[in-house]
Amino acid sequence: MTRILLARHGETDWNREGRWQGHSDRPLNAAGLAQAEALARRMAGERIDALYTSDLARASQTAEAVRRRTGLEPIPTPGLREVDVGELAGLDRAEAARRYPDWYTRWREGTVESYPGGEQFSDLRDRALGAFDRIADRHAGQTALAVCHNGIVRAIVLHVLGLEPGARPRIAPGPNCSLTVVERQRRRLVLVALNDAGHLDGLV
């Protein structure tokens, strides 16, 4: 059995302010650093064979906290990057609704296919699943931790559950540094945990 642990990165100021980040390279804030340490303490109690991370700073900082606790060297993986939100980077929900009212309404309904000037959701899905499959193949029968982003986690969960990208609104975003666990059991993928934040008591 192969276990892939998907950890969302710790909090940034833009997370706290409700702003879209996408490929914007924002660092962790003080709360995010504390969340990363809590995740690292939990991972120190797990048997983990490999550590992967998105190459964006908020993920690599989170992975660095895990490295200090486990001794595993993070492997930067561009395929784990957050979705490119294009022209929405830095905007909060209210600003996006004012600038792109039609798009925003359809986004809330799950009927848009991309962000304005950004990545197609189908491309995000293919990228996320490609990274997931490579990690799972490389660590067959082992456990690997991948520090990534909400968009990546949701794309993988939708695939595991057999849902189309338009079902995104049905998958709640997890708190920063929450854990989602997927197991590959023979040829079947099983969602074992979604947005587990038990290690973040008092930090979310």
Task: Please give the residue ranges for each predicted region.
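Active-site metal-binding loops of divalent metal-dependent hydrolases
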Residues: 10, 150, 197
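Domain-level recognition of soluble alpha/beta enzyme cores
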Residues: 164-188
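Glycine-rich phosphate-binding loop signature in dinucleotide/nucleotide-binding domains
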Residues: 44-47, 135-142
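Acidic, His/Gly-rich catalytic cores of divalent-metal-dependent hydrolytic chemistry
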Residues: 192-204
